[in-house]
Amino acid sequence: MGYRKLGRTSDQRKAMLRDLATSLIISERIETTEARAKEVRSVVEKLITLGKKGDLASRRNAAKTLRNVEILNEDETTQTALQKLFGEIAERYTERQGGYTRILKQGPRRGDGAESVIIELV
């Protein structure tokens, strides 16, 4: 399966995709360029599939990709992005067989004309 280089070295590209995937899991909606969104879509789809499995090996594989970021909930409790993935997001998509994300085009970005999109969880 091919991938986009995104104008970066492999370690920079992996770090950027980890950050984007973690941000998408936390906020469930991010704005980025079209190329980055298409690339992070495959990462997030695989993470959600791991979350649906729910076993220890899947949790460890997902922990390799996601950043260890704590989220403050409305009820003043904290959880990590990994806990959110295996808790509420995995429950939401138990009946769905893939296609967990949606990409909405916004048009060109003002500064450099790059195609701007919103990627969100369905």
From Swiss-Prot:
Record key words, sorted: Ribonucleoprotein, Ribosomal protein
Gene Ontology molecular function, alphabetical: structural constituent of ribosome
UniProt xrefs under PROSITE patterns: RIBOSOMAL_L17
Keyword match Ribosomal protein: yes
GO annotation (BP), single: translation
One Pfam short name: Ribosomal_L17
GO cellular component: cytosolic large ribosomal subunit
Gene3D superfamilies associated with the record: Ribosomal protein L17
Subunit-structure text: Part of the 50S ribosomal subunit. Contacts protein L32.
Family named by the database record: Belongs to the bacterial ribosomal protein bL17 family.
Record-given protein name: Large ribosomal subunit protein bL17
Lineage of source species: Bacteria, Bacillati, Bacillota, Bacilli, Bacillales
